[in-house]
């Protein structure tokens, strides 16, 4: 089969509130029993090109792949004149992105509900979807979902209050402290906190160098305040218990972006959740060294065999 990179032909769709999203679709590998569609939901500041390797690994497992860039990142439309700002008013807008993609594209690919693989922020949005719309997704695998985040150098409660204050005082469209000076292309590998794999890190940077429009410098106060508000929703009593879909959650043993202990506690409350820790891995497990990725894919394959029997 042609690689996901070679076969990539961008598609575009529009949400109900008029936002243009970039998407991609890939067929499953030939000669392998077809398992259905796998929806891949990327994390904050990511883009389709970063996941070409993951797409091919899913295709080799019998899945057709459907993925898109969230509004405000990748090749999708930006809300502000400064295209390097990650900006959102409410995470319900991300839910609209997912709804539009499911309705306009995914539901036409297969008669059965899709499977889903989601990372970090994408995992957070998917968990809210599983809670609010049971049955739309057959089963889901998560890589380090965003349920609580590190807020260094501030305590979490203070960071939440600061974000609210900045929005209240008309600074919601400004970068959070220090973000405007960030240049992801110039960040040395040794200073990154998301992967310990220099080859995959360099590949991500190469995509950004080839198309700088994919770059984000950092979030606005509106984005951060909306993220805190959404995480407060998933932390409500009974929320995890109400998610009944079969779920696999992989957490990273050396995560410095999301708080692993919060994810584990959430997973333990879900009625049909398998949790596994990838010891030593940084936040982006799927962009990690082969030895860490192998642990994820072994757990994924075992989960698929149980969650989607006969496919």
Predicted features along the sequence, with ranges:
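Active-site glycine-rich loops that stabilize anionic/oxyanionic intermediates
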Residues: 35, 41-46
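Conserved alpha/beta-hydrolase
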Residues: 48, 55-81
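Catalytic active-site module of serine/aspartate enzymes centered on a nucleophile-bearing elbow/loop
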Residues: 274, 279-311
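N-terminal cap/lid segment of alpha/beta-hydrolase-fold proteins
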Residues: 1-30
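Short beta-strand/loop motif that positions the catalytic acidic residue
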Residues: 243, 249-251, 255
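Alpha/beta-hydrolase-fold enzymes
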Residues: 127-215
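Alpha/beta-hydrolase active-site loop
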Residues: 86-106
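Short alpha-helix in the alpha/beta-hydrolase fold that links the catalytic acid
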Residues: 245, 259-268
């Amino acid at each position: 089969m042609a690689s996901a990179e070679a076969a990539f032909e961008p598609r575009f769709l529009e949400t109900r509130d008029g936002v243009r999203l970039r998407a991609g679709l890939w067929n499953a590998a030939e000669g392998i029993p077809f398992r259905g569609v796998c929806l891949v939901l990327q994390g904050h500041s990511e883009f389709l090109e970063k996941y070409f390797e993951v797409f091919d690994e899913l295709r080799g497992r019998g899945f057709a792949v459907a993925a898109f860039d969230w509004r405000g990142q990748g090749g999708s439309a930006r809300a502000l004149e400064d295209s390097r700002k990650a900006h959102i008013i409410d995470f319900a807008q991300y839910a609209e992105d997912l709804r539009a993609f499911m309705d306009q594209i995914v539901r036409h690919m297969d008669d059965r509900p899709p499977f889903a693989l989601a990372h970090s922020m994408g995992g957070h949005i998917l968990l809210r979807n599983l809670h609010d719309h049971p049955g739309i997704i057959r089963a889901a695998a998560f890589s380090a979902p965003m349920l609580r985040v590190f807020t260094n150098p501030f305590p979490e409660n203070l960071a939440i209050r600061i974000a609210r204050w900045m929005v209240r005082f008309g600074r919601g469209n400004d970068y959070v402290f220090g973000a405007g000076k960030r240049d992801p292309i110039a960040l040395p590998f040794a200073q990154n906190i998301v992967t310990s794999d220099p080859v995959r890190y360099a590949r991500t940077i190469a995509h950004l160098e080839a198309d700088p429009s994919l770059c984000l410098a950092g979030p606005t106060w509106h984005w951060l305040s909306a993220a805190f508000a959404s995480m407060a929703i998933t932390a409500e009593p009974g929320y995890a218990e109400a998610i009944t879909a079969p779920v696999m959650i992989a957490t990273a043993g050396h995560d410095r972006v999301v708080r692993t202990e919060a994810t584990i506690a959430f997973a333990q409350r879900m009625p049909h959740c398998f949790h596994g820790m990838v010891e030593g891995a940084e936040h982006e497990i799927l962009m990690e060294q082969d030895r860490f990725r192998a642990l994820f894919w072994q757990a994924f394959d075992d989960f698929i065999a149980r969650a989607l029997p006969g496919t």
